[in-house]
Amino acid sequence: MVSKQKIEELVKKFGRNAKDTGHLPVQIAILTEKIESLKKHFEANKKDLHSMRGFIAKVNHRKALLSHLKSSNYELYLETIKALNIRK
């Protein structure tokens, strides 16, 4: 579970202003944080297949957002993946 404070920090870091939650890098950063949180959950609960479905949905949503960002603004895409450390 990602705290409200952590989400606010991500919005400030990746958004254009403090309330810019719709900006693609902000959405990707929040999804990445939720994915990392779920990874820790699955280390302790290997058989939780119900949550795995939601996890896979989040990963696929992030993948689609990254693809859209890559096609629309490649420089911002590179900055985002570097800041979040999600790809090589």
UniProtKB/Swiss-Prot annotation:
User: Which keywords, in A-to-Z order, does the entry hold?
Assistant: Ribonucleoprotein, Ribosomal protein, RNA-binding, rRNA-binding
Q: Does the keyword Ribonucleoprotein apply?
A: yes
Q: Indicate the transmembrane segments per the record.
A: none
One Pfam family, short name please? Ribosomal_S15
Q: Does Cell division count among this protein's keywords?
A: no
Single GO cellular component term:
cytosolic small ribosomal subunit
Q: Which GO terms describe its biological process?
A: translation
Which terms does the record give in the GO molecular function aspect? rRNA binding; structural constituent of ribosome
Q: How does it assemble?
A: Part of the 30S ribosomal subunit. Forms a bridge to the 50S subunit in the 70S ribosome, contacting the 23S rRNA.
- HAMAP family of this UniProt entry? Ribosomal_uS15_B
Q: What PANTHER family does the record point to?
A: RIBOSOMAL PROTEIN S15, BACTERIAL AND ORGANELLAR, SMALL RIBOSOMAL SUBUNIT PROTEIN US15M
**Family assignment from sequence similarity:** Belongs to the universal ribosomal protein uS15 family.
This chain belongs to which protein, by name? Small ribosomal subunit protein uS15
Which organism is this entry from? Metamycoplasma arthritidis (strain 158L3-1)
